[in-house]
Amino acid sequence: MQINILSGALGAEILNFKLNAITQNNFEELNSLLLEHKVIFFRDQNISSEELMSLGSLFGPVEEHAYVKGLNDFPQITRIVKAANEKNQWGEGWHSDVSYDVKPCKTIILRSIKIPPVGGDTVFSNMELAWETLDKDIKSIIENKNALHTSNGSKFFVEDFSEMESNGNIGEKYSNEHPIVRTHPETGNKILYVNPTYTKKIIGLPNKESDELLERIFRHQEKLDLSCRFKWTENAVAILDNRCTQHYAIADFYPGRGLGHERIMDRIAIVGDQPF
């Protein structure tokens, strides 16, 4: 096994490591890599859907997506498809997956199936480092406060992604409050747990003050020195700790630049704990 660090903030590409050979007996090595690097990448993984599910189940129960219908044989696997003529990219914009849930998923596994020849990278950001480097005046205000996280409903993907199908929860929206500074249940590290896609308000502050403070926090979270960037190739797998990272799928292969290509990914998510 060889470990190539991708940036000083987070991320590592793991070479000479076959994910379909992972069992409960050697899982701890994989989990230790994830806790250390927060997002880990593996190329040239000939891993089937059944093996992907087995891999995910080592981290915990695999959940179905709130809005998207999964594969017929594996409903917990969400197939993310951007057709060649579509502009939007699923996962565009900084976010932590399903932070609006009572128990947001703890781990996400992504598998690339079809990748555009140019563009389509994903950027990941370290929210433990974001907390460590946040201005002290902001820390003093938010350290013991909660924030409201609200989903956007399913309408956006029903309209924008023709190749993806709703599971029937068209009008459903979910809202939950979580600590702005959560604690990682495995490491004890502090995490800045808000994101511009789903976090709507700081509880206990007037709307104007909440909006202004969240905007300052979001600008801090977007700093490139908190991030790493991964260029996908087909049959690559990313495993990310959704508790302490955010990610952004870049939509830079739209036909307007002559780069209209299909992009297909599979996603599974592992049930998490209620943030504390």
Question: What are these model-derived regions, one by one?
Answer:
Residues 1-237, 242-276:
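Non-heme Fe(II) oxygenase catalytic core, chiefly the N-lobe of the double-stranded beta-helix
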